[in-house]
Regions:
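Core catalytic lobe of class I
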Residues: 1-205
Length: 205
């Protein structure tokens, strides 16, 4: 087991080497636990610059670790520090699917289009919407009329991408001992976690 000073020296050298080969639009994600994350954050501020700090992502692993008792709470998350090389870094917003309850509450309107039930919500049109735009929306069946005769915009469920991902990730579990993807590596990351990171910070091809 490494002591803290040796680990931080090793981490510093590796981060410097990684930065030297990063492209201008690249990002780096560093997965850490509660023991060391705050120390590594200071290193990364020095190496990449405080202005290039993007997010401290909280990844809830679903299984608690460490002492749990009257003097401590179970530790149920790790941290993923995200830094970019510069202001031109790639960022593709990722989305989470709506829950059934969310759909029921927010997309509460229904209508039949081409024999199929479609859900939608109504949204504010905006004061800058021109008459020409409103007429086009009417032709496209995108105007919802309220009981008082007001006009709102129809936003169909099948035209939305979901809920934009924030910096608290609770939907990806750690790799358990029975998982098909398990390779017996102590700090193995779930494929779903790696896929999310790749999609968020790189373009296809």
């Amino acid at each position: 087991i490494w002591d803290k000073e040796r680990y931080l020296n090793w981490m510093y050298e590796n981060l410097m080497a990684i930065k030297s080969v990063m492209s201008d639009n690249a990002s780096i994600y560093v997965h850490l636990d509660w023991h060391i994350v705050h120390y590594v954050k200071i290193l990364m501020d020095e190496i990449f610059g405080e202005d290039n700090f993007v997010n401290d992502i909280t990844w809830k692993r679903q299984t608690s670790s460490g002492f749990k008792g009257k003097n401590a709470m179970g530790k149920n998350h790790d941290n993923i520090l995200l830094y970019c090389k510069g202001e031109d870094f790639i960022h593709n917003t990722q989305y989470l699917p709506y829950s059934d309850d969310y759909i029921e509450q927010r997309f509460s309107h229904k209508e039949i289009i081409n024999g199929k039930e479609c859900r939608f919500k109504d949204a504010f049109l905006g004061t800058a919407t021109t008459d020409a735009t409103i007429e086009q929306l009417k032709r496209d069946n995108k105007i919802y009329y309220t009981s008082s005769g007001g006009m709102r915009l129809k936003v169909y469920l099948n035209e939305t991408e979901g809920i934009p991902l924030d910096d608290v990730w609770t939907d990806i579990n750690a790799v358990n001992s029975q998982a098909d993807e398990r390779v017996d590596y102590a700090t193995q990351k779930p494929e779903a976690l790696l896929e999310r990171i790749i999609k968020a910070s790189s373009d296809e091809g």
